[in-house]
């Protein structure tokens, strides 16, 4: 039987230190034939040389381009995603440049997608992940079971649980997500997750099939609940991202979103301009996150215009 094919979309920027480990783990997936398409965001280290090395080693499974100008994280991924409109793979996945995929990562996602209730607009999969140190020693799961049980359609309007490097989608959702190119957003993974939750099928796997390497400035995960002054500084620099996401969601998919959800999405879209919308976000119980602490942070973000 011919194995199914998955196109893995990888974005790189100055990632030479861990890139070979990441590429080898993707190309060694079991139960599926993985192909990689990479967009490099004008790296200044040895990243491009490594990409060329893999292109020569895997000419039928690996391709890359170097951007003419720096696009930054979100739009490097989005432009790479939209460049695949003319491709014909069974599945599509996103990939970071510094993690390690367990051999069954993609095949486990495929099995979950195939077991899910079908939807005409396709199925979007994301999963838990194992946070690891720079030497890939596990530190713990990013999402604990208690928090996952509290995830609802209401909470996902205010909190993203889809980490891009865990995302796998079927061909139907890939086509559906190409319907609208979003302008001025942050977080490509949250964008696709919102499309799936409100207009297609979204599934979350509590199991983890990826070692999510923590190093340098990308420290998250098991320490994210601890107070720090660095966290306060990060909050002060934080940009509001939800209104733009909801604006583009309405523009591209508003005709497919259930009426009550659409009203809530429009409230989030307009809260910075309309006092009534801000008050609704502050006092309506539908606008919450998965714990009292996270909901309090949400209300502070709304009050300060950071949401």
Predicted regions and their residues:
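Nucleotide-sugar donor-binding/catalytic module of glycosyltransferases
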Residues: 1-225
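C-terminal subregions of glycosyltransferases and related glycan-biosynthesis enzymes
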Residues: 179-185, 213-307
